[in-house]
Regions:
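Surface-exposed binding/hinge segments that line
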Residues: 3-4, 302
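Twin-arginine (Tat) signal peptide motif
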Residues: 4-20
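N-terminal compositionally biased, intrinsically disordered segments and leader/signal-like regions
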Residues: 4-5, 28, 62
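N-terminal secretory/targeting leader peptides
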Residues: 18, 38-125, 133-134, 142-341
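Bacterial N-terminal signal peptides
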Residues: 18-31
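Sec/Tat signal peptide C-region and signal peptidase I cleavage site
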Residues: 32-38
Length: 341
């Protein structure tokens, strides 16, 4: 009788070999390149038109993505209304907005103090006070509104632009001038005796083209990107209102990041001082091109500018007082910082 050999392995051995094979397969699979962890999408918004200011805001957007060390995919998008953009961030529909202090005043009215006409005796004074104190002043105010202040970007100084030259306050008096909804705009033009016509930004450009208004005020690097550069080709360098912007994040979205990611983002952002320097350096060649294209830049002297200052500055305390106690405190803190320089 022939003896047959069983080809079946003992059950225990089969189980051991099966487990070993499964382990090897898992190890091999882990070593294979697979899909990267999904990045969270963050949208960064501002109202910047094509030009230097938009370039800055796109750089901020890219820096946020880079600083987060691969955790975020960032994209810049345009929203024409700063108030709308800010509300989108407050509600968490967008993650970051780059908004002027005037725009920020829609959620924290006292921040409009920074746009007070002729708040600073000189650009150098404003730079020093803002660089030393603004983060500490503005950060806690916005934190209470569900926003995290990450830093600042620059827009520049408002100047007067007009269809006909407006080189002195006397030439402004009685003229139909576009006044923005911001109290600072109403205060400035009211102090000069202008016939103010309130228009939102989007309606200002057709208003100038159609003669509804004869002048307005805007930062030069923004102005030249708009239709106003053609319809109101006279610019007087009054330098009356310094405009800068907060980079603000939705607080809940920010708190989802690790401390290392938050720190990386803050360090990756371009400094306000560097962006401010770029804006000011860009003005000279941009003005030269503007003049070559037929525009007129009226470079008034310090003595001529003082005529504007003397009509506006005395009304500052009463203007700020109308904003309420929080604004008065911020204004007083600014004055104390100016004196301490």
């Amino acid at each position: 009788m022939m003896t047959t050999l069983s080809l079946q392995r003992p059950r225990a051995r089969r189980g051991f070999l099966g487990a070993l094979a499964a382990l090897a397969l898992a190890t091999f699979a882990a070593a294979l390149p697979g899909p990267a962890a999904a990045k969270e999408e963050w949208r960064v918004t501002s109202a910047a038109q094509p030009g230097l200011l938009k370039d800055h805001h796109v750089r901020v957007t890219e820096a946020i993505g880079k600083g987060a060390a691969g955790a975020l995919k960032t994209e810049w998008q345009f929203i024409a209304s700063e108030q709308e953009a800010l509300q989108q961030v407050v509600r968490g529909r967008l993650q970051v907005a780059i908004v002027s202090t005037l725009g920020l005043s829609s959620v924290a009215p006292e921040l409009a103090v920074f746009a007070t006409p002729y708040l600073w005796a000189s650009p150098a004074e404003g730079d020093a006070v803002i660089d030393r104190h603004a983060m500490n002043w503005v950060g806690p105010i916005l934190d209470a509104k569900g926003l995290v202040l990450l830093g600042f970007t620059e827009t520049g100084f408002n100047d007067v632009m007009s269809k006909a030259p407006l080189r002195t306050p006397a030439e402004v008096k009685g003229r139909k001038i576009r006044v923005s909804p911001a109290p600072s705009s109403q205060f400035f033009w009211g102090s000069l005796g202008a016939n103010g016509v309130q228009l939102p930004l989007g309606e200002m450009f057709p208003g100038l083209e159609q003669g509804l208004v004869e002048g307005a005020d805007l930062p030069f690097v923004y102005y030249i990107t708009t239709p106003a550069a053609k319809s109101a080709p006279n610019v007087t360098l009054t330098r009356h209102t310094h405009l800068f912007n907060g980079i603000v994040a939705n607080k809940a979205a920010w708190q989802k990041l690790t401390a290392a990611q938050q720190d990386g983002i803050r360090k990756a952002l371009p400094s306000h001082a560097s962006l401010r320097g770029e804006v000011r350096a860009a003005e000279t060649p941009l003005m030269a091109k503007f003049e070559a294209d037929g525009g007129k830049v009226h470079r008034i002297t310090d003595a001529q500018r003082k005529a504007w200052y003397d009509l506006v500055a005395p009304g500052q305390p009463a203007y700020v007082e109308k904003m309420g106690p929080a604004a008065v405190k911020l204004f007083n803190d600014i004055q104390a910082a100016r004196r301490a320089r």
